[in-house]
Amino acid sequence: WINSGKVNDYRIIEPSEYITELGLEKSSTKLLPKRTTVIAITGATLGKISLLEIDCCANQSIVGIVENNIFKGEYIYFWMKNIINRLIAWQTGGAQQHVNKDNVNKVNILIPNEKILQKYYIQVRPMFNKISSNCFENKNLQRLRDLLLPKLMSGEIRVPINSKVLISKNN
């Protein structure tokens, strides 16, 4: 389960919280597959766009655009980045501005010919895969830091000081 605050993340690699199978069945939410482009349509995150790197559900303040055989996540993500200001211009509501889900559904999408689209995917997909890999690696490094730092600060783990390591390469 992700809330709209998660859309601030460049890539969504973990949920805000977890939902049970029963919770999924009893609610109106749908499971969004990995590589879905998500857009925050209300509140402080209005207009923020992210890409799911996991399967997850979202609350009603998020719209998901699922890739298909023609339009992959890489294309949808950048197309939505390109037109988001138009969507925001259509916002409605008094107290809390929001973009109507129907307006998202009405957005026209540029359809390049298949050859151009395939060339685009060949160029962009490796970069998207690397970004995804880096996001997961960063999260693992953060967890490792959070595990080790308190132990280092308390003295539970000691780092041996090797004089050879401390010598500058410039000396």
Predicted region positions:
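A generic structural signal for residues embedded in beta-strands
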Residues: V38-A40
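Conserved catalytic-core motifs characterized by acidic clusters
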Residues: E14-P15, I49, A95-H98
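Sequence-specific dsDNA recognition surfaces
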Residues: N3-K34, E53, A58
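Glycine- and aromatic-enriched periplasmic loops at the membrane-periplasm interface
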Residues: Q60-I62
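Amphipathic alpha-helical coiled-coil/heptad-repeat segments
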Residues: I70-F71, Y75-F78, N82-Q97, D102-N171
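Short, Lys/Arg- and Gly-enriched loop/turn segments at beta-strand edges
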Residues: L46-L52
